[in-house]
């Protein structure tokens, strides 16, 4: 027990720090109101109600975008139940928010202990990694999946380290377990980025093994890790496989639309190039790693919120500074805050580049540079283009600036290695070979901070963005433009200088601790404690700028967002089994950026990062233009739909949009408007018009009346048995008789064979029967379903229950069994070792 006492103390310290940061909100039960979290609640309400009512999970919901799979809405599979139990134990059953910081610290601590670092130094490492500013920016933004995935990456790499340190079985089990946990956390982008880090590590261990003539050991460890990776992946195979299949149909998949000219270069098997690089870190902005507000801070902060800036403000413009411009003046469209790793941490990292020996140092330095260069995105397009075009899967992810998480990992890791070198060898910095490195480190960190403090303009050519200048020219009289720009420049220089002085003095204080230790004036334990306190104060205070107690609200605030309004009540009085609602409140920006509507209704709009690509293309080509026409027409008609031209919104009608929610008054009130022109749940058509490609298909919708003609790609001609003429008259009827999100039942009657179009979103995996006999489903009108229905009276049933889930679940259970066997073997061998010692 005594052996594990330092570890228990470190874990207890992590718990105390986590509770302390979120005090008193954690004690009072207050929560953060997070847009992404609230959006998830709204989008998932139909699925939640179905689970509570039936005890089964639906893999399809009609709550947003007309309908989509639930694979990326809190994905859950039976095979992961036991894994979630293990996760709860690992988290020590700590409450929300508190647990996030705790697992972030614990994961890095495990990694450092795997390297053989002392518990006390590993504890410091856990703190400086976990308190990197980016993580505390993720929490209020609601990017919890990303946060948790990042928390499980250091212990995953710990397994890699253990395996290469010849603890094969333990390393394999740890790797498999934490790969499984991070994939379960469902942010593949972060896992993908850290695959590059692992490759750097493997390269370093290969070099080390080659030099030591231990290549058999290297290949043995690599084989075990490869098996562990397969096990970890297979535990989550249900999620991974269905996410992969789904991604092909989303904006991350390849569009079938052919574009010409410059736009054609954007078309690939992944996201558009501009979309991928829209959030690119500025080259000069990289200095935020050392000085947090080197680009002003966050986009959400006005100039009036900065004391340093307002000390330089011209009182004449104070009213403007309370609204515009924002503190941030970097190259990203918007940012909640900078990526800051700690001034003295950065100092130790740079110092580590000189005093730490071995291939692992070069791996960490290489990974850091790699991360920074790729984070520049459109500001460094040579490398970015290469990765988008040639590196598998890189073009599936947007916001390239987020690859800086690699630097946030490698910088504190090398910093701890450097501190270990210093504390274990007090004369390290006295050595002649290290003096130059120490001087260079001071110049590159404290020196840069000092220059930024004294002359911020030395690194930047301007402090006003192009967009700001354009807005100022529109807003200000010509005679005020130059004085205002000069004053704003002075204020932004003051913001930079304030934080630069801060970083400079933090580095100097840290160096003082090292100097006193080197002079034998301070013991190693006190030096470590002093540095730990310095780093904690530094990073804690920066993080409080972006996540503080004022942001926490009572839990009731979350539910208030979904309180049923009078408009909702009025719409819900409609007992029709299935129809859609289109919310015009906040149009045009809000319709596809909120899920409050989806909480109570089946929405045409919605918010999700991975919507179906064809639906997005319909939004761009038809839905948004029709919304503009409809908004203007309904407003002009004063809500009297009988005087509105229904031909202006045929796509909305074919989506069975029965209700529009329109703003009424200036206090956020809304009113429902019944759309009498909605086509209903399904209809027979007179004609099937086959087209050769997606462009013809989406363009044809401009020229046809969907209730009469169905536009179908020739690829689906066989599914409709080549029918070109449908059959539609007053005797042909079809009615929805039963509705579940994943199962629809219709009664149809027709004197002759005909084609029925359903106002449901087409997606591979939906199956259909007519009177119990399987039939094919075709795609019609770009996004809808169609079936060839024979003459007579029939029951048509459609359901979504992919058989692939059963297959992948079997694989997942087999992988879990392998992991359990590994744990049992490890426990047995450890028990035998203990028995032999006794």
Enumerate the predicted regions with their spans.
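Active-site-proximal, structured, solvent-exposed surfaces of multi-pass membrane proteins
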Residues: 347, 658, 705-838
């Amino acid at each position: 027990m005594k052996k594990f006492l330092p570890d228990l103390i470190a874990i207890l310290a992590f718990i105390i720090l986590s509770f302390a940061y979120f005090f008193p909100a954690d004690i009072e039960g207050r929560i953060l109101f997070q847009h992404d979290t609230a959006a998830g609640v709204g989008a998932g309400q139909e699925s939640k109600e179905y689970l509570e009512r039936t005890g089964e999970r639906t893999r399809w919901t009609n709550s947003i975008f007309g309908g989509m799979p639930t694979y990326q809405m809190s994905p859950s599979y039976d095979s992961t139940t036991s894994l979630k139990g293990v996760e709860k134990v690992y988290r020590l059953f700590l409450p929300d928010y508190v647990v996030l910081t705790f697992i972030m610290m614990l994961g890095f601590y495990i990694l450092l202990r795997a390297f053989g670092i002392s518990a006390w130094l590993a504890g410091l490492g856990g703190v400086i990694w976990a308190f990197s500013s980016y993580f505390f920016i993720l929490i209020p933004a609601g990017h919890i999946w990303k946060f948790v995935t990042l928390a499980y990456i250091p212990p995953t790499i710990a397994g890699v380290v253990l395996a290469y340190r010849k603890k094969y079985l333990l390393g394999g089990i740890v790797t498999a377990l934490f790969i499984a946990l991070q994939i379960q956390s469902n942010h593949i982008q972060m896992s993908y980025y850290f695959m590059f880090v692992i490759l750097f590590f493997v390269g370093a261990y290969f070099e080390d093994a080659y030099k030591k003539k231990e290549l058999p050991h290297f290949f043995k460890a690599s084989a075990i890790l490869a098996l562990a990776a397969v096990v970890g992946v297979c535990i989550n195979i249900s999620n991974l496989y269905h996410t992969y299949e789904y991604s092909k149909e989303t904006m991350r998949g390849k569009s079938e639309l052919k574009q010409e000219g410059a736009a054609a270069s954007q078309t690939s098997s992944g996201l558009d190039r501009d979309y991928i690089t829209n959030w690119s870190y500025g080259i000069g902005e990289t200095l935020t790693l050392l000085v947090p507000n080197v680009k002003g801070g966050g986009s959400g902060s006005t100039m009036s919120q900065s004391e340093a800036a307002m000390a330089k403000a011209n009182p004449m413009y104070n009213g403007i500074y309370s609204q515009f411009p924002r503190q941030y003046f970097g190259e990203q469209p918007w940012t909640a805050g900078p990526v800051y790793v700690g001034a003295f941490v950065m100092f130790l990292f740079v110092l580590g580049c000189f005093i730490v020996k071995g291939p692992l140092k070069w791996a960490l330095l290489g990974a850091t540079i790699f991360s920074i260069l790729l984070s520049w995105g459109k500001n460094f397009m040579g490398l970015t283009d290469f990765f988008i075009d040639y590196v598998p899967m890189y073009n599936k992810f947007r916001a390239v600036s987020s690859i800086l998480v690699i630097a946030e990992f490698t910088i504190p890791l090398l910093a701890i290695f450097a501190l270990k070198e210093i504390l274990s060898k007090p004369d390290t910095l006295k050595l002649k070979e290290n003096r130059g490195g120490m001087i260079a480190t001071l110049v590159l960190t404290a020196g840069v901070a000092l220059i930024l403090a004294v002359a911020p303009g030395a690194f930047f050519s301007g402090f006003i963005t192009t967009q700001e200048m354009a807005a100022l020219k529109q807003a200000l009289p010509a005679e005020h433009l130059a004085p205002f720009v000069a004053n704003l420049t002075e204020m932004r220089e003051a913001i930079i200088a304030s934080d630069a002085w801060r970083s400079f003095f933090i580095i100097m204080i840290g160096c003082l601790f090292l100097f006193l230790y080197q002079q034998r004036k301070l013991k190693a334990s006190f030096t470590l404690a002093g540095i730990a306190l310095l780093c904690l104060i530094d990073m804690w205070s920066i993080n409080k700028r972006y996540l503080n107690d004022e942001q926490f609200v009572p839990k009731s605030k979350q539910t208030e967002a979904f309180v049923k309004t009078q408009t909702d009540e009025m719409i819900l009085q409609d007992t029709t089994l299935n129809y859609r609602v289109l919310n015009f409140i906040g149009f045009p920006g809000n319709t596809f950026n909120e899920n409050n509507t989806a909480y109570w209704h089946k929405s045409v709009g919605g918010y999700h990062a991975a919507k179906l690509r064809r639906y997005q293309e319909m939004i761009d080509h038809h839905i948004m233009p029709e919304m503009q026409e409809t908004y203007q027409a309904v407003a002009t008609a004063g809500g009297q739909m009988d005087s509105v031209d229904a031909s202006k919104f045929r796509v909305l009608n074919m989506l069975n949009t029965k209700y529009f929610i329109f703003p009424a008054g200036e206090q956020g009130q809304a009113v429902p408007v019944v759309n009498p022109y909605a086509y209903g749940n399904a209809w027979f058509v007179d004609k099937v018009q086959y087209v050769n490609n997606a462009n013809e298909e989406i363009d044809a919708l401009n020229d046809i009346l969907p209730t009469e003609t169905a536009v179908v790609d020739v690829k689906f001609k066989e599914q409709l048995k080549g029918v070109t003429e449908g059959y539609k008259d007053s005797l042909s009827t079809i009615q929805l008789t039963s509705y579940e999100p994943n199962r629809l039942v219709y009664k149809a009657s027709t004197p002759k064979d005909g084609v029925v179009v359903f106002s449901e979103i087409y997606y591979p995996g939906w199956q259909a029967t007519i009177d119990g006999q399987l039939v094919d489903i075709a795609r019609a009108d770009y996004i809808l379903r169609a079936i060839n229905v024979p003459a007579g009276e029939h029951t048509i049933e459609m359901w979504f229950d992919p058989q692939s889930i059963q297959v992948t679940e079997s694989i997942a259970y087999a992988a879990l069994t392998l992991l359990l066997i590994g744990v049992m073997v490890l426990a047995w061998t450890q028990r035998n070792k203990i028995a032999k010692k006794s």
